[in-house]
């Protein structure tokens, strides 16, 4: 019996592209999403056929597109980054913005929490990476002189707490690996022929995967700083994520969501959306725009148990895929 993914349902409330999806570590029935509609939504998952979840709270305050959102490990706070140049911390119980992080001079493209939630990292079009504490104080800035020569599109902490590490991806076509303790560069990973949109670190912190314009995913050994192998995605990659419990890597591309088994390096799934079938199932509501519009996935995240894949699209709809056997 092979494992595959089937469309379980959709979630509609955003009115523009879904830029990021955050799932809780305790696998509770909520997710948080960000969008170009300038809002962040806290969803309650109902897991019903027509609508997989309902918008419980919409958080507004950013004055431009919200590009990224992540959750604290206790699930009480969301952290967002926006093209307005700011980060915000949100109390999910009240929906209030409790803190603003001001310092970047251009759009914030990516944010992350350290595993203990005590540190925050952000990446920006101003070509810097900033390290903050939760009080909103910037503790360190990695500037262009030491760092990336172009926009920094994505930044992530490694889950490996024994070797505290930050990984960043940039439009300068490189991935950089930083020592978190002193913010010094450990490795520069070069090999892409186009700008990078995304980098993901494996659950054990041993690997990272990067992707962007050239449509090729490169897998790297983080400890050694070496390229391991490449996977052909075939079109621009917008988001990458590792499964929490299977040796799978997922890519959101402009053609489909493609999933590889990293042991065999074979494609397990190639998920495409059937808008016509979807419209029939959901009484004709297909998000924004007309039905002939080409839509694609821009954000991805697994549930903590690895059984559900949440995918956010350019039409503002979140499509939910579940593991099935056939």
From Swiss-Prot:
Gene Ontology BP annotations:
cellular response to abscisic acid stimulus; positive regulation of signal transduction; regulation of translation; ribosome biogenesis; root development; seed germination; shoot system development
| WD repeat locations | 13-53, 61-100, 103-142, 147-188, 191-230, 232-270, 290-326
The record's account of tissue expression is: Widely expressed.
Domain of life according to the entry: Eukaryota
Give one GO term, molecular function aspect: ribosome binding
Loss of this gene results in the following: No visible phenotype under normal growth condition.
A matching Pfam family: WD40
Ordered alphabetically, the record's keywords are: Repeat, Ribonucleoprotein, Ribosomal protein, Transducer, WD repeat
Query: GO cellular-component terms in the record?
Result: cytosol; cytosolic ribosome; nucleus; ribonucleoprotein complex
Q: Which InterPro entries match?
A: G-protein_beta_WD-40_rep, RACK1-like, WD40/YVTN_repeat-like_dom_sf, WD40_repeat_CS, WD40_repeat_dom_sf, WD40_rpt
Q: Which PROSITE patterns match?
A: WD_REPEATS_1, WD_REPEATS_2, WD_REPEATS_REGION
Q: What does this protein do?
A: Minor component of the RACK1 regulatory proteins that play a role in multiple signal transduction pathways. Involved in multiple hormone responses and developmental processes. MAPK cascade scaffolding protein involved in the protease IV and ArgC signaling pathway but not the flg22 pathway.
Family, per the entry?
A: Belongs to the WD repeat G protein beta family. Ribosomal protein RACK1 subfamily.
How does this polypeptide assemble, per the annotation? Homodimer and heterodimer with RACK1A or RACK1B. Interacts with GB1, MEKK1, MKK4, MKK5, MPK3 and MPK6, but not with GPA1 or MPK4.
| Protein name (Swiss-Prot/TrEMBL) | Small ribosomal subunit protein RACK1y
């Amino acid at each position: 019996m092979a494992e595959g993914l089937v469309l379980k349902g959709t979630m509609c409330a955003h009115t523009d592209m879904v830029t990021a999806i955050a799932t809780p570590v305790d696998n509770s029935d909520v997710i948080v999403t960000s969008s170009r509609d300038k809002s962040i939504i806290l969803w309650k998952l109902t897991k019903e056929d027509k609508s997989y979840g309902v918008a419980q709270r919409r958080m507004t305050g950013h004055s431009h597109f919200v590009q990224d959102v992540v959750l604290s490990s206790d699930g009480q706070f969301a952290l967002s980054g926006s093209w307005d140049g700011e980060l915000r911390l949100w109390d999910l119980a009240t929906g209030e913005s409790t803190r603003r992080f001001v310092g970047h001079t251009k759009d914030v493209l990516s944010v992350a929490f350290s595993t203990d939630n005590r540190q925050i990292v952000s990446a920006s079009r101003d070509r810097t990476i900033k390290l903050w504490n939760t009080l909103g104080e910037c503790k360190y800035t990695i500037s262009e002189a030491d760092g990336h020569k172009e926009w920094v599109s994505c930044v992530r902490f490694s889950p490996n707490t024994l070797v505290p590490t930050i990984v960043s991806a940039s439009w300068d076509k490189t991935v950089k690996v930083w020592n978190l303790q002193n913010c010094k560069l450990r490795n520069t990973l070069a090999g892409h022929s186009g700008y990078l949109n995304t980098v993901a670190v494996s659950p054990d912190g041993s690997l990272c995967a990067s992707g962007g314009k050239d449509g090729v995913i490169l897998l790297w050994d983080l400890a050694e700083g070496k390229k391991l192998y490449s996977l052909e995605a075939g079109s621009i990659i917008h988001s990458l994520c590792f499964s929490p419990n299977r040796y799978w890597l997922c890519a959101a591309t402009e053609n489909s969501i493609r999933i590889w088994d990293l042991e065999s390096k074979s494609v397990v799934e190639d998920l495409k959306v059937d808008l016509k079938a979807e419209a029939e199932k959901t009484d004709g509501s297909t998000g924004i725009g007309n039905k002939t519009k080409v839509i694609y996935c821009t954000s991805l995240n697994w549930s903590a148990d690895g059984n559900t894949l949440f995918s956010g699209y350019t039409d503002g709809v979140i499509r939910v895929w579940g593991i099935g056997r056939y």
